[in-house]
Regions:
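Active-site catalytic microenvironments in core metabolic enzymes, especially phosphate/sugar-handling
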Residues: 1-235
């Protein structure tokens, strides 16, 4: 299939106009490779192990959630040079769907809600609120990642969930207005924890967003490449 036809399909899945302003210039086809696409790989991040795995399976396209070119590039050296060299030598296209896939039907947050078996759901401006039947240990097992809590959440209960860095006070307040008794996201800061009107559940960024890319790959018949960071909790 021609890359142009594939891009049309991708834009139907995650319409570019649903992306937030911060993603201007950071989504879509950010690295061009071959025109003829016979195999598609999918991952959360563009890392060297991911690119090597995509090249080994002779994928023509890598669909990811996070761009490897977030900040303006003023020099191509070190790890970035090594990454781009691997991508270009594999003639690999890289396509990014970020906040447009966060907001999309069947996207990052829908996949997270499905994984946690949320029911009676309501959409927030970003994320989903719903009744969660799982206990804290069960949530940690579903996510395959450590779970840290602030406050005293009592699960099962109604929770708000936002994949990625979602601990913004307006989002937490929005979840509370929808009846949430706890809030799950990643990358919590001290001031956010102190200001929150709800008990908070923190997992890793990867654990909350990779299910969406994995489910997308399964739906589309792509190869999902798993490359989780190594995490541990010491007490």
């Amino acid at each position: 299939m021609d890359i142009g036809d594939v891009i049309q399909d991708l834009e139907r899945i995650a319409p570019p106009d649903r992306a937030e302003e911060m993603d201007t210039g950071r989504i879509g086809l950010i690295i061009e490779g071959r025109r003829d696409i016979r195999k598609v790989a999918c991952a959360l991040d563009v890392t060297l192990p991911v690119v090597r795995a995509a090249a080994a399976m002779d994928a023509g396209l890598l669909v990811v959630h996070h761009t490897p070119l977030w900040t303006p590039v003023t020099a191509v050296s070190g790890p970035l040079a090594a990454l781009l060299r691997q991508i270009l030598s594999a003639d690999l296209n890289v396509y990014v769907m970020h906040t447009n896939f966060d907001h999309a039907e069947g996207g990052i947050n829908d996949a997270l809600a499905s994984l946690l078996e949320l029911s009676g759901t309501g959409r927030m401006s970003l994320g989903i609120c719903g009744d969660c039947p799982l206990t804290l240990p069960e949530i940690a097992r579903r996510l395959s990642a450590p779970l840290i809590t602030w406050g005293r959440p009592s699960l099962p209960c109604r929770i708000g969930v936002v994949g990625g860095s979602g601990f913004d006070l307006p989002l937490i307040e929005e979840a509370a207005a929808l009846g949430a008794e706890a809030f799950l996201s990643a990358d919590l800061k001290h001031a956010q924890a102190r200001a929150s009107p709800l008990p908070l559940l923190q997992s890793t960024h990867y654990a909350l967003e990779s299910p969406g890319m994995r489910m997308l790959a399964g739906r589309m018949g792509w190869e999902f490449i798993d490359d989780p960071p190594v995490t541990a909790v010491w007490t």
